[in-house]
Amino acid sequence: MDSVAFEDVAVNFTQEEWALLSPSQKNLYRDVTLETFRNLASVGIQWKDQDIENLYQNLGIKLRSLVERLCGRKEGNEHRETFSQIPDCHLNKKSQTGVKPCKCSVCGKVFLRHSFLDRHMRAHAGHKRSECGGEWRETPRKQKQHGKASISPSSGARRTVTPTRKRPYECKVCGKAFNSPNLFQIHQRTHTGKRSYKCREIVRAFTVSSFFRKHGKMHTGEKRYECKYCGKPIDYPSLFQIHVRTHTGEKPYKCKQCGKAFISAGYLRTHEIRSHALEKSHQCQECGKKLSCSSSLHRHERTHSGGKLYECQKCAKVFRCPTSLQAHERAHTGERPYECNKCGKTFNYPSCFRRHKKTHSGEKPYECTRCGKAFGWCSSLRRHEMTHTGEKPFDCKQCGKVFTFSNYLRLHERTHLAGRSQCFGRRQGDHLSPGV
């Protein structure tokens, strides 16, 4: 009978490797080792006066010393004790035939049972079981769970299965495809503007139920995190941290390709996909600008056409986005759901309400480093700083006039869209001057 090395059925770590394991990996190692000992006992090893629990206090030393006391040590092969040295040891049929069907693709270890390999694979930090290329001898159910390789019951040959995900639901407007009808319906609402979830407290509706539930917490007062800079209440700690960074200016996530920094990992991923990964194949016919997806192109084209999609049923005024329409409708209903508990003044919008609260507290945490003037809002400070720098980054593409803020530019562009012959604030015949 061929000898089988002890490492073939036991996971062994050196003292240096053991020190690098996390507590969860050490607990996993403990469980695997315990099962290994039990399996050894089941094939004929008699464990006398052995306290298994004490064994795990120092696994690296106790494991070797225990085997050495049972088997002795072969000269010149310090850690390759074999089953042939263990008295009354009878290997099972798999080991007698030499079949070792379970092999780890990471470190090369082989195991007699797939359960040993399954647990061993988890010990590899960051190794996903679905990526395992090892040889598995499993039931059909577990072959399906493994998802990478399956064994034919007739021939025993392994065949590779490449899973494919079909997306049968395709949007006719932008071409985006989905594999779920629910996600497809939610996406369609972004084009139609349909909002099925309506708030009973105020005139506001939502396309997605999760957004509706989050909004409901605003009325119940279920807000756990409040920003010390602006007083805005936020539901979740992750969103709260991102919001605080908008005040502090911290941008810990940096793009490795262009060096641009972002306040969250999600913004960084979006930037990497749109700016570096995707080919910008959608080109605007008006200005020639290229964008990565058709939906971005549709949004961009509205800036040229002045297209407004959402119309007020009472005054026929139209808006580009549904939230602007909902805010406008409050002017007709007279609804002012936000009330100050100090002076009783009411407001239409939560942003105006938060800004008003600072008039009572006198809080102005944003101070200009040049003149010392303080502001209650970070945006107000940024606007003020431009008066020192003279920065005017927004310029009109048609007449060349430059502006300090984008909203000033948008107001100016309407004069061109309306067909006026002169620019905003400039009489006909005046020379063009780049300034506000």
From Swiss-Prot:
One of the record's GO molecular function terms: DNA-binding transcription factor activity, RNA polymerase II-specific
Pfam families: KRAB, zf-C2H2
Spans annotated as Disordered: 128-164
Keyword Amino-acid biosynthesis attached: no
Domain KRAB: 4-82
A Gene Ontology biological process term: regulation of transcription by RNA polymerase II
Superkingdom assignment: Eukaryota
Biased composition (Polar residues): 151-163
Renumbered zinc finger spans (C2H2-type): 102-124, 169-191, 197-219, 225-247, 253-276, 282-304, 310-332, 338-360, 366-388, 394-416
Compartments it resides in: Nucleus
Extent of Basic and acidic residues compositional bias: 128-141
Any one cellular-component term (Gene Ontology): nucleus
Expression (tissue specificity): Expressed in a variety of adult and fetal tissues.
Keywords linked to the UniProt accession: DNA-binding, Metal-binding, Nucleus, Repeat, Transcription, Transcription regulation, Zinc, Zinc-finger
Family named by the database record: Belongs to the krueppel C2H2-type zinc-finger protein family.
Job description of the protein: May be involved in transcriptional regulation.
Protein's name according to its UniProt entry: Zinc finger protein 101
Organism: Homo sapiens
Taxonomic path: Eukaryota, Metazoa, Chordata, Craniata, Vertebrata
Gene name per UniProt: ZNF101
